[in-house]
C-alpha cells in the first residue's frame, strides 16, 4: 500500500506576541492546502528584524497557548535551541531531513517578507527544500521587485492546490484582511489599553500574569 506524501507547512516569526493575524492566516492556509501540520516556528535571533521585546521562553509559551487544541497548528521550537541567527534556510534543511523524500514542505511568507527575499541568507536555495506560499492582503502593493520577476515567471503556480512535488514552486493565497500587528499590540499594552480580541484569550491571560509589554513604572509606586 502506497503511503500518501505528508504535507507540512512552516510559518516563522518573532511572534512578539502572536496574534489573530498570524493565527487566522495560518489556519486559512492549512485548510486550503489540506496540510497535515502547520508549524509555527518562533525565531530566536531574526537577522532582518529588531530583537524581540520579551524572552524566547515567553514567546514560545504564548504561541503554545495560542494553538493548543487547534489542529493542524503546532509549534516548532528548533530555532530557539540554536545559538546563532535564525536563518530560514537552516530551518528548512533541518525539517526536510526529517521528512520522507516525497513529503511536501510549504514555507508561508507575508508579501513584505517575500519581496525582501533577495536580502536573505542563501535565498536562492529555499525552493530546493520547499514550496513558497505568499500570504497576500488586498491592501498590499502587488508590484513585485525586479529581482523576483524572473523567479516568478519560472516558478509561479496560479492555483495553490496545483503545487506538485516536494518543493520548487511559488503560489499566492489571499488572506482575510485583518489590520493588526504585533507592534500595535505592544503599543496598546504599553499605554495601558486592552488588546482583547486582538490576541487569543490564553495569550492575553499569559501577558497579564507575567506583566509583559507594560510600560516601566517610573513613579516609585509598587
UniProtKB/Swiss-Prot annotation:
Superkingdom to which the source organism belongs: Bacteria
Pathway: Cofactor biosynthesis; NAD(+) biosynthesis; deamido-NAD(+) from nicotinate D-ribonucleotide: step 1/1
The entry's keywords: ATP-binding, NAD, Nucleotide-binding, Nucleotidyltransferase, Pyridine nucleotide biosynthesis, Transferase
Listed Pfam families: CTP_transf_like
Record field: catalytic activity: nicotinate beta-D-ribonucleotide + ATP + H(+) = deamido-NAD(+) + diphosphate
EC number: 2.7.7.18
MF annotations from Gene Ontology: ATP binding; nicotinate-nucleotide adenylyltransferase activity
Biological processes per GO annotation: NAD biosynthetic process
PANTHER family hit by this protein: NICOTINATE-NUCLEOTIDE ADENYLYLTRANSFERASE-RELATED, PHOSPHOPANTETHEINE ADENYLYLTRANSFERASE
Function per UniProt: Catalyzes the reversible adenylation of nicotinate mononucleotide (NaMN) to nicotinic acid adenine dinucleotide (NaAD).
NCBIfam families (UniProt xref): cyt_tran_rel (TIGR00125), nicotinate (nicotinamide) nucleotide adenylyltransferase (TIGR00482), PRK00071.1-1 (NF000839), PRK00071.1-3 (NF000840)
Name of the protein in its database record: Probable nicotinate-nucleotide adenylyltransferase
Annotated family: Belongs to the NadD family.
Name of the coding gene: nadD
